[in-house]
Amino acid sequence: MHYARIVSNLRLGYDIIHMAEYVTLTTNRKAFHNYFLEEKYEAGIMLLGTEIKSLRSGRVNMGDAYVKPQRGELWLVNAHISAYECSGHTSHEPMRERKLLMHRKEIVLLMSKVKEKGLTLIPVRIYLKNDIAKVELSLGRGKKLYDKRDTVTKRDTERELEREVKYRNFRR
């Protein structure tokens, strides 16, 4: 999987290959279903060499992932990064805890918000920013069952309206 685009430079007469600035590798779709997401934060992630290779090939699952504070640090737990198939016997453990890299002031601010307001810290997506792996964290408040039903019905009605408008425009 390559994330490049070719930009032609007519004046110089050659093509330049630019890597995309942001490449989303995976999103935590359960987070959007189970939480009202409020503020977003960016954190680096400490990975091994085989983990970044598996990440680039898209072999990651964040379905049950969460962030755990421990001794003034943030840890990503239950994120499954599959073993890299070309690594042989030196591969990593797929479900290991991975350290998240943020400034100390940001970590203290996040932990104070989590303690005060009853919010939780949820990993929303993993992406590459200038070829460096990053995790987008979000402060979220848990949804009740009726909130989930409301969002599903709103989404269904919006889809019906879009289909109807599309069908009307198509009939003309």
Curated annotation (Swiss-Prot):
Protein family per UniProt: Belongs to the SmpB family.
Matching CDD domains: SmpB (cd09294)
Any one Gene Ontology BP term: trans-translation
Keywords tagged on the record: Cytoplasm, RNA-binding
Function, as annotated: Required for rescue of stalled ribosomes mediated by trans-translation. Binds to transfer-messenger RNA (tmRNA), required for stable association of tmRNA with ribosomes. tmRNA and SmpB together mimic tRNA shape, replacing the anticodon stem-loop with SmpB. tmRNA is encoded by the ssrA gene; the 2 termini fold to resemble tRNA(Ala) and it encodes a 'tag peptide', a short internal open reading frame. During trans-translation Ala-aminoacylated tmRNA acts like a tRNA, entering the A-site of stalled ribosomes, displacing the stalled mRNA.
Locations listed in the record: Cytoplasm
PANTHER family membership: SSRA-BINDING PROTEIN, TMRNA-BINDING COMPONENT OF TRANS-TRANSLATION TAGGING COMPLEX
Origin superkingdom: Bacteria
Listed GO MF terms: RNA binding
GO cellular component: cytosol
Pfam short name (any one): SmpB
Main location per the UniProt record: cytoplasm
Keyword presence, Cytoplasm: yes
Name of this protein: SsrA-binding protein
InterPro entries: SmpB, SsrA-bd_prot, SsrA-bd_prot_CS
